[in-house]
A protein has these predicted regions:
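Carboxylate-rich, polar loop motifs that coordinate divalent cations or form catalytic acidic clusters
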Residues: 1-154
Length: 154
């Protein structure tokens, strides 16, 4: 009787354990570059990839590439886009080492620059951010040299 009960118990447990399904995504699937710096999932279920070529969004079927602009100029992702966050309202934020903050505008389906550290130049001699962090209050903390700047996203 104990063996039969054990067999049914093991059968029930094994049927609850499902196999994980993995899918490889590469350049042949539309990924803009194999070098990926950050990955973030947004509130709508999209997977965002910060690559050496910019931002890619995966909807489960297709990958769409986004160019991030500062005005009319393309932002070089490999040196200017470094951190990727989602806030409590599921807005996607991208922060770059040169002190720029971008958010994904769902209405216009593009990234828009919303903040730039005043006085921080585009050349490497003037310094860069060493870290950026988004806290639970949706504030982005920008750390550079001997000072910290807080940007409130609301």
């Amino acid at each position: 009787m104990g063996r039969i009960l054990s067999a049914f118990l093991m059968l029930g447990i094994s049927s609850m354990c499902g196999a994980q399904i993995y899918k490889y995504l590469g350049i042949e699937d539309g990924l803009s570059n194999r070098r990926i710096y950050r990955i973030q999932k947004d509130g709508r279920g999209y997977m965002w990839f910060l690559t050496q070529e910019g931002m890619d969004r995966y909807d489960g079927k297709r990958i769409r590439h986004y160019t991030v602009l500062d005005g009319n100029l393309k932002v070089a992702p490999q040196v200017n886009l470094n951190w990727l966050y989602t806030d409590t309202e599921n807005t996607l934020w991208v922060v770059g080492r040169k002190g720029r903050i971008f958010h994904y505008d769902t209405l216009h389906d593009r990234f828009r620059m919303v903040y730039r550290i005043p006085g921080l130049q585009d050349d490497f001699a003037t310094g860069m951010l060493c870290y950026a962090y988004m806290d639970r209050g949706d504030r982005i903390w920008l750390c550079q040299g001997d000072h910290i700047i807080r940007y409130d996203t609301r």
